[in-house]
Each structure stands twice: as C-alpha cells, then as structure tokens.
Curated annotation (Swiss-Prot):
Source species of the chain: Digitalis lanata
Protein name: Phenylalanine ammonia-lyase
Localization, UniProt: Cytoplasm
Pathway: Phenylpropanoid metabolism; trans-cinnamate biosynthesis; trans-cinnamate from L-phenylalanine: step 1/1
Presence of the UniProt keyword Lyase in the record: yes
Length: 713
C-alpha cells in the first residue's frame, strides 16, 4: 500500500495501527508481554529521566508522573516533526472558515445549542472560555477546592501530547507556551471539581485557556509557590513575547475539549499503584518469614495449574524472597517438632496471598495500558482530517476508559489493602502469630506495653475507608448540559477517588512495614532470649541434677536434654517477662519433665541420694536465682548492639527493605519503656513512601530474580 499523508505525518498503512491488526487487539495484547516487575522497572527508569520528548504517540504514565512530581527537574521537549501536522490542521480551519464551511464549534454554538450560528469565530472561542470558567475555588485555610499542582502539570503535558498529533486545529505556538509554563514550573490554578469528563474536562481545562488568553480571573502558582496573574506568568515564562493569545476559530475548543485532566491524574495514580502492588507482594513474603510460615504455598505447580499470569508472578516473586531465607530454614526445624499438634497449613491471608494479589495486579496492568492509550489518543471534537479535507464530528472526548479503568483500579487497591489488614491482624494477635507477643509489644513488662494496639485500630479505620472508596463512581452519571451530555464518564472524579484510595493504601503500607520490622526485631530478641534460657537451664541442670551429694553421677542427669526440648517448644514471649513464675508455662513444663523422670526412676526414688524428686526443689531454687538476671543480661546485650546471635534478616533477600526502614529512615524497635510512639515511626515511613524513596530498596529485594519461578523438582 502506498504511503499516505495524515495531517503532515506519513503512515505506511493508512489509518490501520498494524496491517493485520485493524481493530488493535493484537497491539493491546502485546503491550502486556513480559513480567509486571520488568514493567515497574521500566516505569521507574523513565520516571527518573531528565527529559520528556513529546511527539503525540509515545507518552507513558511514568513520564506523566515525573512531570507531575518532579517540577522543573524534568524538561519537556516538543518534536519539531510535529510542527507541520499541527500547522496543517490549524491552516485548514482558517481556510474552511474563510470559505464559509459550517463546522461545529467554529461557526456553531456548543453542545445542545449547536443550532446557533456565527461568523465571529474568534469571539466565539473567547465566549467558550468565559462560560466554562464556572469553577469554584473557595477561600480560607480550612479547605481547598483547587486541583493539586501535580495533577494540573500532568493535564498540561497530556493535552500538549494530544494536540501535537495535528487533528485539532490549534497553533504550534500555543503548545510551545504551555510547554514553557511547564519548564518554568508555572502552574495554572484549576478548580478541583466541576467536570464530568464527557465532552472532555471542559471546566478545568478552560482555566489553562484562561491563562493563555489573559483572562483577569486567571491565576497561576510560580516556582516558589507565589501567586501569579496572567501577565506575571507570561513574563516569568518568557512566553509569546509576553503577549496573550487571541484565540483563532477552533482553538478554544481544542484546548478544552479533551480528557487530559482525568487521564493525567489517572497516570499519576497508576504509577503509584504499580509500585504499591509490587510492594504488597514483597511484604507478603516478609509476613511469611516472620510468621514462621510454610513456603510450600509458593510452589510453582500450584500456580501453573491455575493459569493466571498475575498469580503465577506473585507466587514466583514470593518464592524468590523465601528461597534460602534463614527464617524459612529455622521454621522448617520448628515445624518438624510435634507436627501432629500443629495446623497443617497456614491461614488464607498468607497461604492464598498469590491468588489474592495476582488478579489485582492484572487489573492494574490492564488499566495502565488503557490509560497509556488514552494519553496518546486524539480526544477532542471535531477532528480535522486534512488528508480528506473534512471535519469529523464524533465523541472521542468521552472519557469512559478513564472512569472504567480507575473504578477497576480502585477495587484492586481496596483488595490489596484488605489483604494487608488481614495479615496485620494475624501479626499482632498472639493466638495466630506463632509466638510473637500480643500487639508486638517489645518491652519487659507487657502490662505496661500495648505495642501496636493503636496501630491496629488505625489500620481498621484505614481499611474501612478504603473499602468505601472501592465503590464505583461511573454508576452515578447524571444527564448534563440540556440532555446533550446525557451519558458521561466521570473520569476525573474516579481518578480523584483513586488517588485518595492510594493515599490510604500508603498509610496502611507504612504502618504494616513498621510492624513487620518490629516483628523481625522481636524474632531476633526471641532467639537471643531463648539461647540465654537454654544456657542457663543447662548450667543449672549440670550443677543441681548431674551429681549426687557425694559427687557420684545422679539419675537426674538424663533430664537435661528433655528440659532443653521444653525451651525449644515453648513460646519465649509466653513467659519471659517473669520466667520463673509458677503460673507461666516454662516452669510448669520443666517441673513436669522432672516429675516424669522421677516416676520412671523406680526404686531409686526411695534412696535420698538417688531421688530425682528431692532434686527438684534445688533445681528450681537455683533457676529462680539466676534465670531472671541472665534473661535481662541477654536483653541488655542486644540493646547495646552485642547480641549473642545476629539478626537473621541480614541473610535474607528482604533485608534491603528492613535496612531502609531501620537504618536509612532511623526508625526504632518500639517498647512501652520509650517515649517514641508507633505513629511517629509510621509517619517517617509514609513521608519517605510519598517521596518515592521506597522504590530502590524494594527493587533491590528482587535484584536476583530472573523473571521465572523456581523449577518444579
């Protein structure tokens, strides 16, 4: 097929995306090739680049997120090759107007009043911007009705990208001016509410147009947060020689009739959603480690038989974290003791975490691709087809892909939060957490240390609000604009709610990370205390049970191994606050062992020199004299950084995450003896997460993963 010119661009196959893919299904499927982890790595790499080059067709959500979050650290460049196509459509509109051709929004009124006609094309565009400036910003400090700075920057970038494709009838100079605003970190003030994203985001986008045309009510925020009027904004940006634009026919419509605000904010949301969903997978693996979970739940055959790629990858990532984990090795030994007295399998929050997270990740990946198609789409009306010399009246401004993808993403985000809450609830509950103290209390006196009890209440609150936000927005459509816009996408509203949901998920993630680090440190403390208890019992047993009164070997010397097995079987935190208490399990079980040996001692019990019963009192008396001191010494040694046993986490693939939370952010092991509260530590992590600082340690945990599950052996 001969090449055709499409508004200044050359395409080998006319309007077909691919010769054998006229409906674009193959291209859409191919976008999901490769692992989610690889996609996240690509996003992060793009996010960190210092230049975004716009040509209309290759913009990514990570580039949008970078422009939104990094202000003037990232420069926007327009492809010079786009200039001809943009000019061609702009010229066509002017020629069409001069010929007297009747075109929507050029010679007609708008929407339900498009039956009106005018030859004053410039005045019509001016009126369009005036009547669309219908937003409310409010005053005072209690609330704001201004769209966040980051969302506005995202919208500006996406709108430029759309208009660069040359189907909208706007001058290239206007796009250059918006680019200058971005590069000089000058951000127009847009209203937070007032759009239904159906004839595009008309109301908020009209405020960008208002700044470009110098409307007296237009405002912007400068690079240092200062308030600017239009004149100051133009001067600071060095835009258009400081002259406001007099809009030509169609240019006002080109600026406002698009989905850029909804899709721009959706891009920001999905960049975060992809990272947080990956974090949820890694945190689930850490949860398995500190809970002494059974790693069998990650076995590849289980997930291969289910077929879902998200589940298979989630399991493979967890398997990678757990493979060779020092916690897993220790847990396997623990599970071998008294196996018939323990649950055969872990609870759902751990065992089915790949099955739970996998579909959510698939939803988020699909939404990501849907939004990437949207931000590279031409989404205004009418579209100027220079090659066929006509204006096409359609409805690409309908932002349904945004509303639907954001509703679906929010449901996935809520599901991730629900799993996180279920895992957190198990972690702090001493009935379920395999020996960790209730509320993860780390202090010496559990009666004066309630650990993460407040955090669990906060997590319940976060989770409840998150579940509420999972409700769809798109089923609340109202017929608008004299029943012309009778179905509308509510794309920006759904995007806003998704950003809210992500903020709550970050609150949950930061709280959960602090709790996981507390659990890691408690396991470290547990090991050191157990060793101290075993050593003390062994020494006391040797002194009191090994020999008789005359130095002869005593039958009770055979008790020592069984006494040490008691220590291995008993949860340390069930007794360690008062290790010699007769009401706690340690002393009860130790006495039980000695009594059982005494009962087996037979005739020797009648002889005072060989009686085990008569040794029990001496054993317990000496143990009470030395054990509390030894336990305290072990705790102090750990607090002083001189533990007898090193922290297992340093041998694990999850260590970079722990190191980041503990060392780089400087969070601490929490106890009731200290002033520091859980909320203060969670705040540090939340702030770091909001700045994107969690990304590097997260990816470092997965550095060695080859993108495939372990082979089935």
């Amino acid at each position: 097929m001969a090449a055709v010119v499409e508004n200044g661009h050359h395409g080998n196959n006319g309007f077909c995306v691919k010769q054998n893919d006229p409906l674009n299904w193959v291209a859409a499927a191919e976008e999901l090739k490769g692992s989610h982890l690889d996609e996240v790595k690509r996003m992060v790499e793009e996010f960190r680049k210092t230049v975004v080059k716009l040509g209309g067709e290759t913009l990514t959500i990570s580039q949008v997120a970078a422009i939104a979050a990094r202000d003037n650290e990232v420069a926007v460049q327009l492809a010079e090759s786009s200039r001809a196509g943009v000019k061609a459509s702009s010229d066509w509109v002017m020629e069409s107007m001069n010929k007297g051709t009747d075109s929507y929004g050029v010679t007609t009124g708008f929407g339900a009043t498009s039956h009106r006609r005018t030859k004053q094309g410039g005045a019509l565009q001016k009126e369009l911007i005036r009547f669309l400036n219908a937003g409310i910003f409010g005053n005072g400090t209690e609330s704001t009705h201004t769209l966040p700075h980051s969302a506005t920057r995202a919208a500006m970038l996406v709108r430029i990208n759309t208009l660069l494709q040359g189907y909208s009838g706007i001058r290239f100079e206007i796009l250059e001016t918006i680019t200058k605003f971005l590069n000089h970190n000058i951000t127009p003030c847009l209203p937070l509410r007032g759009t239904i994203t159906a004839s595009g985001d008309l109301v908020p986008l009209s405020y960008i147009a208002g700044l470009l045309t110098g409307r007296p009510n237009s405002k912007a925020v400068g690079p240092n947060g200062e308030s600017l009027n239009a004149e100051q904004a133009f001067k600071l940006a060095g835009a258009n020689s400081g002259l406001f634009f007099e809009l030509q026919p169609k240019e006002g419509l080109a600026l406002v009739n698009g989905t850029a605000v909804g899709s721009g904010l959706a891009s920001i949301a999905l960049y975060e959603a992809n990272i947080l969903s990956l974090l949820a997978e890694v945190m689930s693996a850490v949860f398995a480690e500190v809970m002494n979970g059974k790693p069998e739940f990650t076995d590849h055959l289980t997930h291969k038989l289910k077929h879902h790629p998200g589940q298979i990858e989630a399991a493979a990532i967890m398997e990678h974290i757990l493979d060779g984990s020092s916690y897993v090795k220790a847990a396997q030994k623990m599970h071998e003791m008294d196996p018939l007295q323990k649950p055969k399998q872990d609870r759902y929050a751990l065992r089915t975490s790949p099955q739970w997270l996998g579909p959510q990740i698939e939803v988020i990946r699909t939404a990501t691709k849907m939004i990437e198609r949207e931000i590279n789409s031409v989404n205004d009306n009418p579209l100027i087809d220079v090659s066929r010399n006509k204006a096409l009246h359609g409805g690409n401004f309908q932002g349904t892909p945004i509303g639907v993808s954001m509703d679906n993403s929010r449901l996935a985000i809520a599901s991730i939060g629900k799993l996180m809450f279920a895992q957190f609830s198990e972690l702090v509950n001493d009935f379920y957490n395999n020996g960790l103290p209730s509320n993860l209390s780390g202090g010496r006196n559990p009666s004066l240390d309630y650990g993460f009890k407040g955090s669990e209440i906060a997590m319940a609150s976060y989770c409840s609000e998150l579940q509420f936000l999972a409700n769809p927005v798109t089923n609340h459509v109202q017929s608008a604009e004299q029943h012309n816009q009778d179905v509308n996408s509510l794309g920006l509203i759904s995007s806003r709610k998704t950003v809210e949901a992500l903020d709550i998920l970050k609150l949950m993630s930061s709280t959960y990370l602090v709790a996981l680090c507390q659990a890691i440190d408690l396991r470290h403390l547990e090991e050191n205390l157990r060793l101290s208890v075993k050593n003390t019992i062994s020494q006391v047993a040797k002194r009191t049970l090994t020999t008789g009164v005359n130095g002869e070997l005593h039958p009770s010397r055979f008790c020592e191994l069984d006494l040490l097995r008691v220590v291995d079987r008993e949860y340390v935190f069930a007794y360690v606050d008062d290790p010699c208490s007769a009401t706690y399990p340690l002393m009860q079980k130790l006495r039980q062992v000695l009594v059982e040996h005494a009962l087996k001692n037979g005739e020797n019990e009648k002889n005072a020199s060989t009686s085990i019963f008569q040794k029990i009192e001496a054993f317990e008396a000496e143990l009470k004299a030395v054990l509390p001191k030894e336990v305290e010494s072990a705790r102090v040694a750990l607090e002083d950084g001189k533990p007898a046993i090193a922290n297992r986490i340093t041998e694990c693939r999850s260590y970079p995450l722990y190191k980041f939370i503990r060392e780089e952010l400087g969070t601490n092991f929490l106890t009731g003896e200290k002033v520091m509260s859980p909320g203060e530590e969670c705040d540090r992590v939340f702030t770091a997460m909001s700045k994107g600082l969690i990304v590097d340690p997260l990816l470092k945990c997965l550095e060695g993963w080859n993108g495939a599950p372990l082979p089935i052996c």
